[in-house]
Amino acid sequence: MRQYRRINNLMGWFTFLIAAVVYCMTVEPTASFWDCPEFITTGYKLEVGHPPGAPFFMLTANLFSQFASDPSEVAYMVNIMSALLSAGCIMFLFWSITHLTRKLVCPGVEKMTTGQLVTIMGAGLVGALAYTFSDTFWFSAVEGEVYAYSSLFTAVVFWLILKWEDCADQPHSDRWLVLIAYLTGLSIGVHLLNLLCLSAIVLVYYYKKNPNANVKGSLLALAGSMVLIAVVLYGVVPGIVKVGGWFELLFVNTFGMPFNSGLIVYIVFLLAVLVWAIYESYNYASARRANIAFLLTIALLGIPFFGHGVKSIVFGIVFLALVGACLWGVFGKRLMVSPRTLNTSILCLTMMVIGYSSYAVIVIRSSANPPMDQNSPEDIFTLGDYLGREQYGDTPRFYGPAYNSKVALKIEGQYCVPVSEEGAPVYQRKEKESPDEKDSYEIVRHKTEYKYAQNMLFPRMYSSANEHIAAYEQWFGGYRNEKGEWVNGVKGRLIPYDECGNPVMVKMPTTWENLKFFFSYQVNFMYWRYFLWNFAGRQNDIQGNGEPEHGNWISGIPLIDNLLYGDQSKLPDELKANKGHNVFYCLPLLLGILGLLWQAFRGQRGIQQFWVVFFLFFMTGLAIVLYLNQTPLQPRERDYAYA
């Protein structure tokens, strides 16, 4: 086994070397299109980019920019950073593949045959190098964007849970989980995509702790992973800012202290409670004190306080009461938490907060008013809006309006006004009228949420922008006739609508039309097309909006391609010779399918691996499609989001 580890390590570094050489030789020499110049600038001069920011990317890019001989080389050095980080991703992918393959080829065997060794190394090389030269990943690897860094974090944390799996029965195995939590916190400062691999991580943990796992247990583990993602995404990330804002208002507006005094007290208090909670849960001299410390920790992190206002506080109190009931065994000993689990949970939360603290860079640099200071997140309240991406608005995902929905109206006196709900207050620093006036925050407005008269489940066609409405119609065969009038493609259904006493009919898409758009555009065109670019082939690099000659996936097999898009031999020469054109004849796709089938039919361990890999793909692919709810006419191809 020692010889296997040596060979495995050497082959991993060999794949890193191949990827690093290829990416560095093909790296973008200057700044690419879209966000790359912005990210390079934020790294070089530590300026503040668009929400929600990428502070840890900024710090790393700044380090690499120091190696530039003059300012003209800065972009090149940041691009080299992406190339090396992507090569690191390939290396950890290799080690993950060999780990999974070894578990199925020779489980529990200390000494393996030469054939088994070649099989394991071959699987790792083929899988890692196939990803190395895939269209989307290669493109992201050679430019100064956050997705190369995000891919590395995903690869590392998945590899770490496999390392934990190898030593899970040892006394200090939890250190791998703590390291995963720290890297997860750091990854928030690069991109939130890394959180999506938590489902696969939880499944690996569950299957290791329950070798004879059943379907029910697997589903419960998946549900738990979704809760874990929600705790980080909707709890820790906005919660720290929210509770910090409460402290700031208390100390500034109530106690009359200077700006940021409440935030400083909050940070010191939070650190003290985290240290106390770690101490109590480690020594466990008093279960009562340990439980109180844990409850105080999750309260200070803002995890239970979903929403805003009184409802947020009530929900938080109920949440804390339920967690406390579990800790004290009110619901039975089965739901009680062991001292080791409690201590590990607190350590993981602490390390995640330490990693997440990279966002302090955003506030510090914004306070210096650099040339690029988007949204100016100089205090805890503007930071909250910055993290919440408030400028982009809300996207309905599970229930909400369609593109033709009308705002609900009501009569107030002699006027017809829209129905709305007052949201969270927006605070800003009050301008002083005299030097002696104390610092304070004032409410400048409340976030307003308008109510719609017509709503539907799982709304996929929701944007009321004129160009999007036209695109929805076109995806259902709509067109302009000779008179310039739209012939609608969406048949829809008519719903009565009371416009303050004036009855009108509103056309709403049917549930079937809504689902048809979801599968035909969002799933097929905006995901499977990108997926097959990398596993089958790509027609060209011209952005497509459904045309048969632009940006489609192809296989390289004329029978299939001509059936899908027409005779490809009749395309103009400039499209045939497009540099983005490549064909793999579906070989990577077939290899992937064969690998999944081989896993699925290798007994219980194989089927468990199958579900781990499946949900890693699902959460970093189709789950993003569900969450983004993309509109047609995207400004650029979005394949980078799924790499």
Q: What role is predicted for each listed range?
A:
Residues 1-22, 88, 113-125, 321-354, ...:
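Start-transfer (signal-anchor) and selected internal transmembrane alpha helices
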Residues 13, 80-112, 156-160, 590-598:
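Transmembrane-helix motifs of polytopic, lipid-linked glycan transferases
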Residues 12-18, 99, 103-139, 148-159, ...:
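Membrane-embedded helix bundles of polyisoprenyl
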Residues 24, 71-75, 79, 104-120, ...:
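Aromatic- and kink-enriched transmembrane "portal" helix at the membrane-lumen/periplasm boundary
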Residues 118-125, 167-185, 214-227, 287-298:
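Short hydrophobic alpha-helices at membrane interfaces in multi-pass membrane enzymes
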Residues 5-33, 131-133, 191, 231-234, ...:
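Transmembrane signal-anchor helices characteristic of membrane glycosylation enzymes that use polyprenol
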Residues 27-39, 49-61, 76, 372-375, ...:
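Extracytoplasmic catalytic/substrate-binding loops of multi-pass membrane glycan-assembly enzymes
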Residues 112-118, 157-176, 203-214, 275-286:
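Membrane-interface transmembrane helices that cradle and orient dolichyl/undecaprenyl
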